[in-house]
């Protein structure tokens, strides 16, 4: 049986935990839920350029300390070929801990993984990319629970309006909204953006702008 390890903390969107539970059941995996405390990691909270490296290393070291791995099991990571061409400091931690990356090793791209997932009737085949909420905080601005909660609330507001794959990036008390390129026209409609902006400001933000480039999923 395949065992899935999931690090649970405030850094993941609330719906992510439900998705993990559902997906592991669907695939017949045994799920290990590991609670982590990233706000106690000083190098993570400092939010320097190496934040992801320290976070990833802490998480995988915690996984590898589990008796399941001490007995000889191998830890696999979901890195794909597209990730290798991006700035991902966490990949250094993966390498240092000898975590295996089979999808990247065989050269699978994100698109190819989606196609194969669809062939195998996996419900996640068209799932929008998700990432740690800490990535939304401007570099070198300390990461706090309050900021992470604010990001989560803002993104939930957008999702309730039907926008998927959103990112709300914070810099001090200002927010930049990034939606999928196909959704830009809808969000740029004055009544829609005005309503969302008012919702954001009611949460304590002072400025709200839209990323005019949008984002690819």
What are these regions (language model features)?
Residues 1-119, 160, 175, 191-206, ...:
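ATP-dependent adenylation/nucleotidyltransferase module used to activate substrates
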